[in-house]
């Protein structure tokens, strides 16, 4: 088995020059030592052991599959212990986001949400969808809500079908957001007509989150 020194030497020798690590998508490695030896994890797998799930970047089918799989896995590990979903996302696909949303409501553990950086569009919707009393944002995080975006091409009848679907999704999202924030649907509709950016404190006052966290409790 490779020892700690060898592993660190290997990682150092493979370190990219000119700050290319992020561009190459390299993930930090954590080494744990136990009575049975040493074991290495990528940082996200190690945090998953602590029931922390990351949703970072665009919300798409791949993101949804990963988040849903982790939520279901953690439920199977312990159905009574909370799961933490950390969000830094500009939003994305409504259908992918709704797959995550439905799974958050479906699993037995409470899913706590925390915004770090930005939770916009579907990211903000999922932030607000966390368990009541367990929705957080860091002090300098930003939250943005708006109506779903869509574009349609083709024949007039096809465009009409797509327009009806967008209107349905807007109405559905507005009702769900009203449920999670305590705002009435009419206000949600007004406030999401255009991009609506909020500070953490504004998001708390609006009902999108419950707490602004400056320190871990």
Curated annotation (Swiss-Prot):
Main subcellular localisation: cytoplasm
CDD domains according to UniProt: S14_ClpP_2
The keyword Acyltransferase is assigned to this record: no
Keyword field: Cytoplasm, Hydrolase, Protease, Serine protease
SUPFAM superfamilies named among the record's database cross-references: ClpP/crotonase
Active-site residue numbers: 121 (nucleophile), 146
Top EC category: hydrolase
E.C. no: 3.4.21.92
Annotated signal sequence range: none
Compartments reported by the entry: Cytoplasm
Keyword Protease: yes
GO molecular function, one term: ATP-dependent peptidase activity
A GO biological-process term: protein quality control for misfolded or incompletely synthesized proteins
Functional note: Cleaves peptides in various proteins in a process that requires ATP hydrolysis. Has a chymotrypsin-like activity. Plays a major role in the degradation of misfolded proteins.
Assembly information from the UniProt record: Fourteen ClpP subunits assemble into 2 heptameric rings which stack back to back to give a disk-like structure with a central cavity, resembling the structure of eukaryotic proteasomes.
Membership in a protein family: Belongs to the peptidase S14 family.
Protein name in the entry: ATP-dependent Clp protease proteolytic subunit
Species of origin: Burkholderia pseudomallei (strain K96243)
Name of the gene encoding the protein in the UniProt record: clpP
